From Swiss-Prot:
Keywords: Electron transport, Heme, Iron, Metal-binding, Methanol utilization, Periplasm, Signal, Transport. GO terms for cellular component: periplasmic space. Residues 43-68, 203-226 are annotated as: Disordered. It is found in: Periplasm. One of its GO terms (biological process) is methanol metabolic process. The keyword Metal-binding applies. It comes from Paracoccus denitrificans. Binds 1 heme group per subunit. The keyword Membrane does not apply. This is Cytochrome c-553I. GO terms for molecular function: electron transfer activity; heme binding; metal ion binding. It comes from the Bacteria. Residues 1-22 form the signal peptide. Its main location: periplasm.
Length: 226
């Protein structure tokens, strides 16, 4: 996260989950349980989630991925957000509007932050949302969600959690704003999901990656020890 977004993120961290925008929660559980922070919070709610990850949603039930427009050398999401990489800060790529994004070299190597996002997603998010952002039988495919959900809406729900109640189930998304294993890498996770959603990054572990920069290490150490 850049210094320009610090004020917004502080507000987001204390935001009430009830204020989250209408739409899809980032992580859900079938049981009626309070939102909670911490690594593996969703798994703690469901009991044996680590041993039995959520089943992936059947392919026939998945909605078609929204189109991503490429005009004048720029990538624009269906929500109008430009995700073209513009500059690097703290070892991460950002757009001209300081929104985190990804960059893949011509030979196929992903930037380190996007690779970091893959690792953090696989460690913290896939139990509910399925591997590679593909979704599950009870949680959405985040690779699709990020194409229509704004970056700050993504942060708000990730920080504060969300609860959706309907006639079929009571779905709970835990809050991760105080979980450093997630929050210190939230931009990386977002960039990874963007790369998956646009189709620029295939499923599985990225085959090639850039090296981890000193700037990334410094920011990582500062966040994890803060």
């Amino acid at each position: 996260m850049t210094s320009k977004t610090t004020a917004s993120l502080l507000a987001i961290c204390v935001a009430c989950a009830a204020s989250a925008i209408a739409g899809t929660a980032l992580c859900a559980d079938r049981r009626n349980a309070p939102a909670q922070a911490g690594a593996g919070a969703a798994a703690a709610v469901s009991g044996d989630a680590h041993e039995q990850p959520a089943a992936e949603a059947p392919a026939e039930e998945e909605e078609e991925t929204p189109a991503v427009a490429a005009t004048d050398g720029k990538l624009v999401l269906p929500n109008g957000q430009d995700i073209t990489p513009d500059h690097m800060e703290n070892g991460r790529w950002y757009t001209a509007e300081d929104i985190p994004t990804y960059k893949i070299a011509e030979e196929g190597a992903v930037d380190w932050a996007t690779f970091s996002g893959y690792r953090r997603y696989s460690a913290e998010c896939h139990v509910c949302h399925g591997p590679d952002g593909e979704g599950s039988t009870y949680a959405p495919a985040l690779r699709k969600s990020v194409l229509t959900m704004g970056y700050y809406d993504f942060l708000e729900i990730a920080a504060s959690g969300k609860q959706e109640v309907n006639t079929a189930a009571n779905l709970v998304m835990p809050a991760f704003g105080t979980n450093k294993n997630v929050w210190c890498y939230i931009d990386d996770i977002y960039a990874y999901l963007l790369a998956r959603g646009t189709g620029d990054l295939p499923r599985g572990r990225p085959a090639k990656r850039e090296d981890k920069s000193d700037e990334f290490v410094a920011q990582e150490d500062s966040c994890m020890s803060g």
